[in-house]
Amino acid sequence: MKFVDEATILVVAGDGGNGCVSFRREKYIPRGGPDGGDGGDGGDVYMQADENLNTLIDYRFEKSFRAERGQNGQSRDCTGKRGNDILIKVPVGTRIIDQGTGETLGDMTHHQQKMMVAKGGWHGLGNTRFKSSVNRTPRQKTMGTPGEKRDLQLELMLLADVGMLGLPNAGKSTFIRAVSAAKPKVADYPFTTLVPSLGVVRMDSEQSFVVADIPGLIEGASEGAGLGIRFLKHLERCRVLLHTIDLAPIDESDPVENARIILGELEKYSEKLFQKPRWLVFNKVDLLDEEEAESRAKAIAEALGWTEKYYLISAANRAGVNALCWDVMAFIKANPKEAELVAKQPEKVEFMWDDYHRQQLEEAQPEVEEDDDWDDDWDEDDEEGVETIYQR
């Protein structure tokens, strides 16, 4: 299935049903009073994370989603039926952005997480709502409000613990094939990897972590060269980056310069991503003798000003891979996910009609002074005979 990590959709919540103007009419009850019911609320639009999905390709073809309209109110104080909600399923890791305001509505970071993205219109009020001591036969009602409409930008960001970083042909896909059941394509030409892939590294029955492999970066990626930097966003939620360096590049390029290219493109893309924990991993040591591999790695680390531990591995024959994976596992256990990676929603998503009803009632209802002598209740005595209104 084609991997699509961005999509734009239109969501429209259902309109609210209109209120009803109606009066009770029965035999022997000529002036039965108002009995117009309220309309039904419009249906809402929800997004839900589904771990069984891994692409947004469906939303390249189906771009519009509309919830059901609420029914109009009816006589006999019958309230209209509420419109049905709709549920849009997206992969876990999807970020939802309102295109109109640029506001991030939320990140869908765990299975079955559900979030409202468009609120249905409020129901209109029937004329029964406007009955008062000075208006016994109200003929006003309110119309249902339109459902909220939003253009949403969906961005899928892979949820992984470890991110692979490096130039094309550095051995990132070979590493993932060696440590997990993932089978990304591996070949001896650049840009074999065209889309991100995930692999689960299971250390034992109770310990595992997820590795993300993205297409390799080249110089000028921040300006769109190669595959650009559009896939770097998939590393934003990783806890550690494995910067993979080819010790014996097939094009005989300088590994130090290659490493600096990656660091430069990373810094241009995001300062936050640049500051993430990053480990140096020297790959393809099997192409050199042991002493030469160690001396090259040491020289590269010194040229980069690297003072921390680095790793020498051969992803092709798994030399040094197991020790690296156990160190990664220990790091992940010692460094739980950042607070922002846990489902963090805005304190409150503002919707259009939150205060609508209160305002409508305040505007439509006249202020009346309280008078204990005035019979302001509609009772059976009022219904059985001719109504007489006394004025002072």
Swiss-Prot record:
Biased composition (Acidic residues): 364-386
Cofactor(s), names only, from the UniProt record: Mg(2+)
Pfam families in alphabetical order: GTP1_OBG (PF01018), MMR_HSR1 (PF01926)
Enzyme class: hydrolase
Gene Ontology cellular-component terms listed: cytoplasm
Compositionally biased tracts (Polar residues): 129-143
EC nos: 3.6.5.-
UniProt keyword Cell inner membrane present: no
Record-linked CDD domains: Obg (cd01898)
Keyword presence, Metal-binding: yes
Obg domain sequence ranges: 1-159
Annotated ranges, domain OBG-type G: 160-333
Region (Disordered): 127-146, 360-392
Residues given in the record as Mg(2+) binding sites: 173, 193
Gene Ontology process terms (BP): ribosome biogenesis
Compartments where found: Cytoplasm
Keywords linked to the UniProt accession: Cytoplasm, GTP-binding, Hydrolase, Magnesium, Metal-binding, Nucleotide-binding
Binding site for GTP: 166-173, 191-195, 213-216, 283-286, 314-316
Gene3D superfamilies with a match to the protein in the record: GTP1/OBG domain, P-loop containing nucleotide triphosphate hydrolases
A molecular function (GO) term: GTP binding
Family statement: Belongs to the TRAFAC class OBG-HflX-like GTPase superfamily. OBG GTPase family.
Quaternary state and interactors: Monomer.
Protein's job: An essential GTPase which binds GTP, GDP and possibly (p)ppGpp with moderate affinity, with high nucleotide exchange rates and a fairly low GTP hydrolysis rate. Plays a role in control of the cell cycle, stress response, ribosome biogenesis and in those bacteria that undergo differentiation, in morphogenesis control.
Full protein name: GTPase Obg
Organism the protein comes from: Erwinia tasmaniensis (strain DSM 17950 / CFBP 7177 / CIP 109463 / NCPPB 4357 / Et1/99)
Gene expressing this chain: obg
